[in-house]
Amino acid sequence: MLNGIHHIAIICADYGKSKRFYTDVLGLEIVREVFREERRSYKLDLSLNGQYIIELFSFPDPPPRPSRPEAQGLRHLAFEVDNIENEIVKLNLKGVATEPIRTDPYTGKLFTFFADPDGLPLEIYQK
């Protein structure tokens, strides 16, 4: 049986820009970074609060993928936060634009969206 989600893999267009975004802006911690010469590709393992959650990959000339929320495939990646207003201020101060706060009609919880450097929709959802 499944125990949970182990990690999410993301292929980025600009490795340096995405690495800075996920570490400096979102605060994920680097677990391991390797360059795979045979693929001319970086693989960056990232954790959040000590839990390994994201693999960030670079590949030479990756094809673009539609990233608007209604495209097939991954719709968005959501992170839980304690205080959405505080997190929005932090993101905005680091140059990240966020959408207006919305209220989930089913749970009454607050959430908003923003995007990573490749346009992947990201969400913060208040606990």
Place the predicted regions along the sequence by residue.
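Exposed loop/turn and edge beta-strand positions of beta-sandwich/beta-sheet ligand-binding modules
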Residues: 4, 40-42, 73, 108
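N-terminal beta-strand motif that seeds the catalytic metal site of vicinal oxygen chelate
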Residues: 1-16, 74-77
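Short amphipathic alpha-helices within nucleic acid-binding modules
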Residues: 21, 85-90
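Core segments of cupin and vicinal oxygen chelate
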Residues: 11-52
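Mid-chain, well-packed structural core segment of small domains
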Residues: 70, 77-85
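A short, acidic/glycine-rich surface segment
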Residues: 31-32, 39-41, 61-67, 100
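Short, charged/polar surface micro-motifs in flexible loops or helix N-caps
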Residues: 49-53, 61-62, 84-85
